[in-house]
UniProtKB/Swiss-Prot annotation:
Keywords for the protein's UniProt record, in alphabetical order: Capsid protein, Coiled coil, T=1 icosahedral capsid protein, Virion
Superkingdom per UniProt: Viruses
Function: Self-assembles to form an icosahedral capsid with a T=1 symmetry, about 30 nm in diameter, and consisting of 60 capsid proteins. The capsid encapsulates the genomic DNA. Capsid protein is involved in attachment and entry into the host cell.
Ranges annotated as spanning the membrane: none
Lineage: Viruses, Viruses incertae sedis, Anelloviridae, Epsilontorquevirus, Epsilontorquevirus calli1
GO cellular component: T=1 icosahedral viral capsid
Residues covered by region (Disordered): 614-633, 646-665
Coiled-coil ranges (or none): 670-706
InterPro entries reported in the protein's UniProt record: TTvirus_Unk (IPR004219)
Pfam family name, one: TT_ORF1
UniProt protein name: Capsid protein
Subcellular location, record wording: Virion
Length: 712
C-alpha cells in the first residue's frame, strides 16, 4: 500500500524506547496531541482571537550511536561473597603528644612509662594484607573464608566516621595508586592544610553540633587501576585500595592558646656554623673583637670578661665580614685528639664552629661565685609573618668533615610550622637515616634574627649537656666570704677544663629538635592547644570482596568410618566464627589450573607460559631436584672418549714421567673422559626428567579441569 510522500504513515508503531538517546518510558501509551481547553466566552467581552503556534524543536546534531564493547571474561567454578566488617584506630595521642604523627601501619614498640605515644594526625593505607592482619588482631570479622580460594575481586568499601563528643577532625580519602609516603606527605597533614583541601570530610564534635546524625557514612568505589576482573590474591594483597588521612583540629581556639599573650614564640637553636666564629676557636674571635655590641648572645651585658680590652669598631666589622675558609684535614686548634672516634669519625664533645664541632662553650655569670649555664640562641617567630618562600628544613650529617656537610631529605618553600610538622617523626620511622647520626638544620628568614642553618633544640639543652668549668671572675669580697686571691669553686669542678668555659658532653641530634616541633605546632592555627591533653578516635569499615576458586561443587562421597578424627589445638588461621583464613600474601596459586586456561581441551599459551615460569620454591609447583651449579665446560669435555684424539691438536712429545708408560697414560686419559661422558649423560637424563615431571603436571591439571567442566 502506497502512501505517496507521506512516508511517516508507513510505520504505525513508534520506535521501541523512542529516540536512542532518550530513556524508555515505563508505560505504554499512544502519542496523542493534547487539545487546548477553550474557556466559555463571557458576555459583554469581545472574543479573544487565538492563533495556534506550532512548536519547533531546537536543532540538534545527530551522533552515531556508539556500540557497547562486549567483554568476555571467564568466571571461576566457585565464588564466595565476603563482607569484612571491622574497626580501626584513626587517632589517639597521649599527654603532650598532639604534635606527633600516628603511624598506624607500623608495628608499635612497647613504650616506657611516661613516654609520648600516638599523635593527632595520621595517614594509613588499607590493603588486603592490612585487613588480614586486623583479623589476626581481632579488629574485624570475615563472613566467608578465603581458604583454598586463589582468586579475588574487589567491589567497594563503606566507611563510617562517628562524631566525637569533644574533638572535631577532618578526613580526606584518595584512591590513587601512587600514594606514597615521603618527606613531603606529612607536612600536608597539618590541620590548616587539611581544612584547605578541595575534597575533605569534616566531622564536627557533638559539643559544636549537638543535633544531627552521630556518624558520617562514605562509600568508596575501587581505585582507578582496578578493573572488574579476577586477580590473584598474592598479586593485589599489597596494593592499596584507599588511603586515609586524619587530623584533629580545634575550631574554637584557632590562633591563641589559653596561656598565650600573642602569636609570637621563642625558638632556641644553635648555629651549625657562623661567620663571627672562625674556623679555629671561638676564643680567637673573643680576643680579637670583644665587647657587648659584638658578642652574639642575648644577654650581652653579662658576657664581658675581665682583662680583655675593647677593639675598634672597624676591626670588628672587618672580622665579621671576613669569609673564613674551610679547615684542612688537620685537627683544629684547641681540639683534643681523643675527642674524635677513630671508627665513626665523629666528635664526642662538641659545640659548633665553621664546619667543625668545638668542645668548649662560654659560660656567663651574674654575681661573684654564681655561674649560670648559657642558653642557646633565641629566635622570635610568628606564624602571621611567615610567608613560606625561602624556608628550608633538611638533615645534615654529624661527621667530622672538611667540606660542606652532607645534606638529605630537604623540603622548602612552605611555612616553617608546616615544614616541621611530622618531619622528625618521618625521619625516625620511615627513613633509613639513623636519628643519632644526623641533625635537623633550619633556614628561615622570617625569624628575628633570621635563622641561617640553625639546629633547633630545647631551651634547657645546655643545662642537660654542659659541664661547667671554673669561674675566675674577680669578686669584691664584700662579706669576706673568700680569702684574697682565692678562686671561686663550683660543682663538678675539673682543673683540666678552661677557666671560664663549659665542656659539652654530646652533640645534638634529631631527637633534640622535638621541643621546637611541639612549640611550632601549638602556636600554629587550628592546632590542639595545651588544654586538650589526651584523646582517641576510631572509625568503622565494611569491605566487600569475592573469592574465587576451582574445586568441584559435587564433592565425592567418602566412607564415614575412614574419616580421620580432628584433634589437638585449633589452627592459627581460624577466627572466632570458625572460618579458616589464609594469608593472601602467601597464597601462591599460579601452579593451579582454572577452567579459563582450557581452550578446546588444551591449555592456552598464557597458562602454559605461567606454568613454565614456576620455580621449585613456590607453593603448588612440581617438586624437582636442586639444580646444580653450571660448570664451565669446553667442547673437549663434551666429546666422546674415542673422538678425543681425532680432535685434539698435536702436542710436542715429552718424555714420560718416571714410573709411567705410554700405555698407562692412555688408560688414565680414557678413564677420565669416560667419567665425563657418564656425567654429561646423567645431566641430560636429569634435565629430561624435569621436563617429564612438568608435562605430567600439565596433563594432570588438564584432566582435572576437564573433569570439573563435565561435573558442571
Amino acid at each position: 500500500m502506497a502512501y505517496g510522500r507521506r512516508y511517516w504513515r508507513r510505520r504505525r508503531w513508534r520506535r521501541r524506547g523512542g529516540r536512542w538517546w532518550r530513556r524508555r518510558r515505563p508505560w505504554k501509551t499512544r502519542w496523542r496531541r493534547r487539545r487546548r481547553r477553550w474557556r466559555r466566552r463571557r458576555y459583554g467581552r469581545r472574543a479573544r482571537r487565538f492563533r495556534r503556534r506550532h512548536r519547533v524543536g531546537r536543532w540538534r546534531k545527530l551522533f552515531r550511536r556508539v556500540k557497547s564493547r562486549v567483554v568476555r571474561q571467564w568466571d571461576p567454578n566457585v565464588t564466595r561473597r565476603c563482607m569484612i566488617n571491622g574497626y580501626d584506630h584513626a587517632l589517639f595521642w597521649g599527654q603532650q603528644a598532639q604534635h606527633r604523627i600516628l603511624y598506624d601501619n607500623l608495628p608499635w614498640p612497647i613504650k616506657k612509662e611516661g613516654t609520648q605515644e600516638g599523635g593527632s594526625m595520621n595517614m594509613m593505607q588499607l590493603t588486603l594484607q592490612f585487613l588480614y592482619k586486623d583479623n589476626l588482631a581481632g579488629r574485624n570479622r570475615w563472613t566467608r573464608s578465603n581458604w583454598d580460594m586463589d582468586l579475588a575481586k574487589y567491589h567497594e568499601t563503606t566507611l563510617l566516621f562517628p562524631r566525637h563528643r569533644n574533638y572535631s577532625y577532618v578526613v580526606f580519602i584518595t584512591r590513587g595508586p601512587n600514594d606514597i609516603l615521603d618527606e613531603h606527605t606529612y607536612p600536608g597533614l597539618h590541620p590548616e592544610k587539611m581544612l584547605g583541601r578541595r575534597k575533605k570530610i569534616v566531622v564536627w564534635s557533638k559539643d559544636l553540633r549537638p543535633h544531627g546524625k552521630n556518624y558520617i557514612r562514605v562509600r568508596v568505589p575501587p581505585p582507578q587501576v582496578f578493573k572488574n576482573q579476577w586477580y590473584f590474591q598474592r598479586d593485589i594483597c599489597q596494593m592499596p585500595i584507599l588511603t586515609l588521612g586524619f587530623a584533629a583540629f580545634d575550631p574554637v581556639n584557632v590562633t591563641l592558646a589559653g596561656n598565650m599573650a600573642n602569636s609570637s614564640i621563642i625558638l632556641w637553636g644553635i648555629p651549625y656554623w657562623s661567620r663571627p666564629m672562625p674556623y679555629n676557636t671561638w676564643y680567637d674571635y673573643w680576643t680579637k673583637c670583644a665587647g657587648p655590641q659584638n658578642i652574639p648572645w642575648s644577654d650581652r651585658q653579662t658576657n664581658i670578661a675581665a682583662g680583655i680590652t675593647q677593639k675598634s669598631a672597624q676591626t670588628c666589622l672587618k672580622l665579621k665580614n671576613k669569609h673564613f675558609g674551610l679547615t684542612n684535614t688537620a685537627i683544629v686548634s684547641d681540639y683534643d685528639k681523643d675527642n674524635i672516634d677513630k671508627n665513626t669519625k665523629q666528635i664526642k664533645t662538641i659545640v659548633m664552629s665553621l664546619n667543625r664541632w668545638y668542645p668548649k662553650w662560654p659560660m656567663k655569670w651574674k654575681d661573684a661565685g654564681d655561674i649560670n649555664t648559657q642558653t642557646p640562641f633565641p629566635y622570635r617567630y610568628s606564624w602571621r609573618e611567615d610567608q613560606g618562600w625561602g624556608n628550608k628544613v633538611r638533615l645534615w650529617t654529624r661527621e667530622c668533615r672538611t667540606d660542606i656537610p652532607e645534606e638529605t631529605l630537604g623540603i622548602e618553600n612552605m611555612p616553617l610550622y608546616v615544614l616541621m610538622n611530622g618531619y622528625i617523626d618521618y625521619v625516625t620511622n620511615h627513613s633509613t637515616h639513623s636519628p643519632l647520626n644526623w641533625v635537623v638544620s633550619v633556614f628561615c628568614p622570617y625569624t628575628d634574627p633570621p635563622m641561617t642553618n640553625v639546629i633547633p633544640v630545647g631551651k634547657d639543652w645546655f643545662i642537660q649537656n654542659v659541664e661547667p668549668g671554673e669561674n675566675k671572675y674577680p669578686s669584691d669580697n664584700a662579706d669576706n666570704t673568700f680569702a684574697p686571691g682565692e678562686k671561686t669553686k663550683i660543682k663538678n669542678y675539673d682543673s683540666s677544663k678552661d677557666e671560664f668555659t663549659g665542656n659539652v658532653i654530646r652533640a645534638p641530634d634529631v631527637y633534640d629538635s622535638l621541643p621546637a616541633q611541639q612549640a611550632l605546632y601549638i602556636a600554629s592555627p587550628f592546632s590542639l592547644k595545651w588544654a586538650q591533653t589526651t584523646g582517641s578516635i576510631v572509625f568503622f569499615y565494611q569491605s566487600k570482596w569475592t573469592w574465587g576458586g576451582d574445586f568441584p561443587r559435587q564433592r565425592p562421597i567418602i566412607d564415614p568410618c575412614n574419616r580421620p578424627k580432628w584433634g589437638g589445638l585449633p589452627v592459627t588461621g581460624y577466627d572466632e566464627t570458625g572460618l579458616l583464613l589464609q594469608n593472601p600474601e602467601k597464597a601462591e596459586a599460579r601452579a593451579r589450573g582454572h577452567l579459563g586456561d582450557l581452550r578446546r581441551g588444551d591449555l592456552t599459551k598464557t597458562a602454559l607460559k605461567r606454568l613454565m615460569e614456576l620455580t621449585s620454591t613456590e607453593e603448588g609447583s612440581p617438586q624437582k631436584k636442586k639444580r646444580r651449579d653450571k660448570e664451565v665446560r669446553t667442547t673437549a669435555d663434551l666429546l666422546r672418549p674415542e673422538d678425543v684424539y681425532c680432535w685434539m691438536s698435536p702436542t710436542p712429545e715429552t718424555p714420560p714421567k718416571a714410573g709411567k708408560t705410554p700405555e698407562s697414560s692412555f688408560a688414565e686419559t680414557y678413564d677420565n673422559h669416560t667419567k665425563l661422558a657418564k656425567r654429561v649423560k646423567k645431566e641430560i637424563h636429569n634435565q629430561n626428567r624435569r621436563h617429564r615431571l612438568l608435562l605430567a603436571h600439565l596433563r594432570r591439571e588438564r584432566d582435572r579441569l576437564l573433569g570439573h567442566h563435565l561435573l558442571r
